[in-house]
Amino acid sequence: ARDAYIADDRNCVYTCALNPYCDSECKKNGADGSYCQWLGRFGNACWCKNLPDDVPIRKIPGEECR
């Protein structure tokens, strides 16, 4: 498991405004919790804590969001 920005199948972050949205999205993917990181590297995006290794994350630098 790792702490990371969760990503969809296009390598795009989950854009957020509030923590409860991120907490729901991250937990349903197996993470312990999360928060909405404002004005981060990818804008306002969900940061998951202890996200399972098989769940896609935003790669840094990685490919761009498609």
Swiss-Prot record:
Disulphide bonds annotated for this chain are 12-65, 16-36, 22-46, 26-48
Provide a GO biological process annotation.
defense response
The LCN-type CS-alpha/beta domain sits at 2-66
Which keywords describe this protein according to UniProt?
Disulfide bond, Ion channel impairing toxin, Neurotoxin, Secreted, Toxin, Voltage-gated sodium channel impairing toxin
Cellular-component GO terms for this entry: extracellular region
Tissue specificity remark: Expressed by the venom gland.
Where does the record say this protein resides? Secreted
Species of origin: Mesobuthus eupeus (Lesser Asian scorpion)
Q: What is this protein called?
A: Toxin BeM14
May I ask which residue range the UniProt record assigns to the signal sequence? none
